[in-house]
């Protein structure tokens, strides 16, 4: 298992080792000890989700209040998506920047998205099934969004992207910042310290 940090701090790309034979393929797509050794933090699983999307569907940009926050560990179990991680943490040195990873049922790559980061993916196959592990249960009142087509963020999405009504009505980054909706960098750092395995 190879794990590398992305351009947005506290986000990681995970490439599992696949074992193929005449029967098919076996892989470990999440392994706590390898994850903790590479990232220096724990992943306390609280919920697992699956979404199925047709080509062109965009889900995001989503994030949760910090504290409590909700980290995610995401993979495409069927089909393919382009997965985006956006830094929404006010005060972060990389605030407003983003990185992306191609997730598909060939490479079987995964992405870890730390608390306070925004998350979006676009389905690039006819159908894409995505599995998420999360560190907190879904809490509707603490879940928020930023508009996926916000030009200030500049994700390479097309204007005809298929959005939910909620995502289409989400504020821009500037509006979310002005309203105090976004996570604070210092609050996120406190949370990262709390889940750190360093020195434990």
What would you call each of these model-derived segments?
Residues 103-126:
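Conserved metal-binding segment of the jelly-roll/cupin
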């Amino acid at each position: 298992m190879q794990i590398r940090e992305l351009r947005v701090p506290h986000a990681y790309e995970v490439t599992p080792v696949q074992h193929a034979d005449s029967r098919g393929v076996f892989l470990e797509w999440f392994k706590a000890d390898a994850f903790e050794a590479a990232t220096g933090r724990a992943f306390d699983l609280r919920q697992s989700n699956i979404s199925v999307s047709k080509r062109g569907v965009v889900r995001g940009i989503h994030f949760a209040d910090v504290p409590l926050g909700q980290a995610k560990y995401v993979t495409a179990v069927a089909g393919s998506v382009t997965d985006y991680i956006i830094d929404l943490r006010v005060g972060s040195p990389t605030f407003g920047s983003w990185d992306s990873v191609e997730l598909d049922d060939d490479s079987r790559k995964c992405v870890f998205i730390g608390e306070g980061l925004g998350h979006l993916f676009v389905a690039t196959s006819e159908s894409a099934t995505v599995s998420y592990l999360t560190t907190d249960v879904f809490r509707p009142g603490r879940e928020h969004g930023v508009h996926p087509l916000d030009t200030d963020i500049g994700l390479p999405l097309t204007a005809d992207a298929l959005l939910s009504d909620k995502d289409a009505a989400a504020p821009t980054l500037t509006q979310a910042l002005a309203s105090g909706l976004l996570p604070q960098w210092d609050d996120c750092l406190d949370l990262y310290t709390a889940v750190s395995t360093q020195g434990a």
